[in-house]
Amino acid sequence: QRGKPVWNEDILAFVPGGSLPQGMSVAGAANGTFGLSSILKSAYATTSELLSCLGFSVKFSDLPKAEDEAQSGTAFWHVREGRKRAWVDLQNDVTVKDIKLSYQEGFRSVEHLKRYSTLGMATDQGKTSNIAGLAILAECSGKTIPETGTTIFRPPYTPVTIGALAGRAR
């Protein structure tokens, strides 16, 4: 739907941004909400809204008693002083060195990095590697992740077993 996630520096993650497609809602950690109490409130509000849109009257019991614990995170995108290769995209064998080299070669755009290094072009479409790759490119350029930009995000997916891809054995 071309909805572009936005970077949330507080949680070091992308969250849904702008308007979601009609009928789509996001709650809890997928929406950047952490802490048990906050997640329960988010789930309650989102479920209530969805059910009322479907014409159901909503009557929930009281939410369970819970508290949010303080949460914090630290960005750790790669080991800076490692002596060996530091892999970023395991499916395409892209390393931190490859990303830094692409920047040195003048590939400053995220899309150029993607094509130069094949970062995020494997079967997972970058779902396991792009954030670390974007962070390393941002570090090279002295910019933030939002200033660096993103590639086009693919819709959520359900993993498929290797057996389903292999077909029948004879």
Question: Which residues are covered by each model-predicted region?
Answer:
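Residues forming the flavin
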Residues: 1-170
